[in-house]
A protein has these predicted regions:
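NTP/phosphate- and nucleic-acid-binding module
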Residues: 1-149
């Protein structure tokens, strides 16, 4: 596409430069770069590998069952952690399905509250990326996550 300028006797081809940027493109790029699928035990595990600081939910709290004692400990942990972190308590379905659901929404860490939490005052912390689990005292939870701030 060009035109002829009769005043200068030149053929001109216009150039269009459209610099565009926006939140939508940035967000889409982030989602694409964090999306991952991997094979685990003959099934496909879908997850978002969000950095701890930008994850919509930073720490998922998963009581092993709906027993009142475990829910109470879970709520106490949430009250401690929600001052500095985005947390969510999930009590629906089996623990394995809850782990998968938290992986799919990009939650970097899940805390499992089980009967050892009642007896020994400990919880199991699971890392989304490595799927490794460690047992730590409930009193050490704030210290564990402070390294990500």
């Amino acid at each position: 596409m060009s035109y002829f300028d009769p005043e200068t006797n030149e053929k001109i081809t216009p150039t269009v430069i459209e610099p565009a940027g926006g939140l939508t493109r940035t967000l889409f790029a982030l989602l694409c770069s964090c999306y991952d699928e991997e094979e685990v035990n003959d099934t496909t595990r879908t997850l978002f590998r969000f950095d701890f600081n930008i994850a919509p939910i930073q720490i998922g709290i998963l009581p092993l069952s709906k027993k009142d004692e475990l829910i109470e400990v879970s709520n106490n942990i949430k009250n401690i952690l929600q001052e500095n972190y985005r947390t969510e308590i999930d009590v629906t379905q089996s623990i394995g399905k809850r782990y998968r659901r938290q992986d799919e929404i990009g939650t970097p860490y899940c805390i499992t509250v089980d009967f050892d939490s009642l007896e020994k005052n400990t919880v199991t912390v699971r890392d989304r990326d490595t799927m490794e689990q460690e047992t730590i005292p409930i009193d050490d939870l704030s210290k564990k996550y402070s390294e990500f701030e």
